[in-house]
Amino acid sequence: MLWIWNALIVFVTVIGMEVIAALAHKYIMHGWGWGWHLSHHEPRKGAFEVNDLYAVVFAALSILLIYLGSTGMWPLQWIGAGMTAYGLLYFMVHDGLVHQRWPFRYIPRKGYLKRLYMAHRMHHAVRGKEGCVSFGFLYAPPLSKLQATLRERHGARAGAARDAQGGEDEPASGK
């Protein structure tokens, strides 16, 4: 029966991490933490960017929780495991799929993965840290809603950014 609780803790943590990551992205990375995150909104030079330090911080916290959980603080290791699972999903979707940091290239053409892909492209369509949309990594609002928000915030510039990306069906290269 304990394994059910452990699995539930991992699952709830993964869901919770999406909320935490979206809030951290919006209010920390696009706020006082912009110094690290700026590198992610510029063309990458080399395999790594300063923004990758956020992954190191979350990984260190996850490792600490797993360690503390293994020393007797039961739920902490499963919270750490959930954070690790979220980190793996984040790496696969955000770094791999969206930003093509894999050795092969795949661009989704339909469904959920296309929605995530395009939502993050719309996030990067805005120059600077202000006025961006879609701060989540594994959930994205409907694309029509994001496009409307961009148009509302940036007027004709949002349409120009979308057109430069080739519209919904043809994402831009780069970030």
Curated annotation (Swiss-Prot):
GO terms for biological process: carotene metabolic process; xanthophyll biosynthetic process. InterPro entries: BETA-OHASE-like, Fatty_acid_hydroxylase. Pathway: Carotenoid biosynthesis; zeaxanthin biosynthesis. It catalyses: all-trans-beta-carotene + 4 reduced [2Fe-2S]-[ferredoxin] + 2 O2 + 4 H(+) = all-trans-zeaxanthin + 4 oxidized [2Fe-2S]-[ferredoxin] + 2 H2O. Keywords: Carotenoid biosynthesis, Oxidoreductase. Residues 11-136 form the Fatty acid hydroxylase domain. It comes from the Bacteria. It holds the Pfam family FA_hydroxylase. Belongs to the sterol desaturase family. This is Beta-carotene hydroxylase. It comes from Pantoea ananas.
